[in-house]
Structures are given as C-alpha cells and as structure tokens.
A protein has these predicted regions:
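A generic structural signal for short, non-catalytic loop/turn and secondary-structure boundary residues
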Residues: 30-31, 55, 93, 111
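Acidic-leaning, charged glycine-interspersed low-complexity segments
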Residues: 81-125
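Small/polar-rich, solvent-exposed N-terminal microdomains that initiate assembly or binding
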Residues: 1-50, 70, 74, 78-81, ...
Length: 125
C-alpha cells in the first residue's frame, strides 16, 4: 500500500521546493523555530466490488511552530504553496491531487501555531 509511504513523498516535495526545518512526526527538543511537523493522520482505500484496491485517500496534518506570528505564517504559506495541486510520483508514491482542507491558528504559552490539514489522493499504480 503506497499510502503508508506518504510522509516520505511529502518530505521529497518540500525538500524540492527548498523548504527546510520540516520534520516527520516529531521535532527534536530545542529545534530552532520556525519549524513544521507533519504526519499522515488518516489513510483509506477505495475498493471495487471485486475487492481490487483503487485510489487511496489520505489526510496529512501539518503543524507550524514559531516564536513570532509572521515567520510561522510565512512557513505555513510556503508549505501550502508547495503542496496544493502537486501531482506526480515522489519516492515511489503517485500523488494524484493535494488540496488544503482546513487551516487554523492559535497561540500556546510560548509559540504561535499554524495547523494545516491536506486531503491527498494517491493513485494505485
């Protein structure tokens, strides 16, 4: 199931766009801000009546953490621009479509947070 490798594909897309300081699942303690953490939040498979796997649908969750609002917003914007509408094969995963499903922002005691949710269609090649 190619969708299980989605985070590798996302890392490749972001790296190719020149976006740095992004981490799969967790960032190490004391990672310089701003940074982003991304993870596959869900994965489902569309089956045919013959139980043949078709497209896979994934949800990608991205959280941007920053000391100041503007730098976090800029990183969130760069990530969104790099991902939305992206198609092709990345790290062996054929991505048919990426769209922004939701975006929220908040502040905790020490950092500004930008939470992004992307819907991704992965084609079963």
């Amino acid at each position: 199931m190619k969708g299980l490798h989605l985070t590798k594909a996302i890392h490749a897309i972001l790296a190719n766009a020149g976006i740095t300081n992004v981490h799969a699942i967790v960032a190490e303690e004391n990672t310089p801000q701003p940074f982003a953490v991304y993870r596959r939040a869900s994965l489902s498979v569309d089956d045919t009546k013959d139980r043949l796997a078709q497209d896979q649908r994934a949800t990608l969750s991205v959280q941007v953490v920053s000391m100041d609002y503007q730098s976090g917003l800029m990183l969130a914007d760069s990530i969104t621009n790099a991902l939305v509408g992206k198609t092709g094969t990345f790290e062996g995963v054929y991505i048919d479509d990426i769209s922004l499903a939701d975006a929220a922002e908040m502040y905790n005691d020490t950092s500004y947070l930008q939470d992004l949710t992307f819907d991704i269609t992965i084609e079963n090649e």
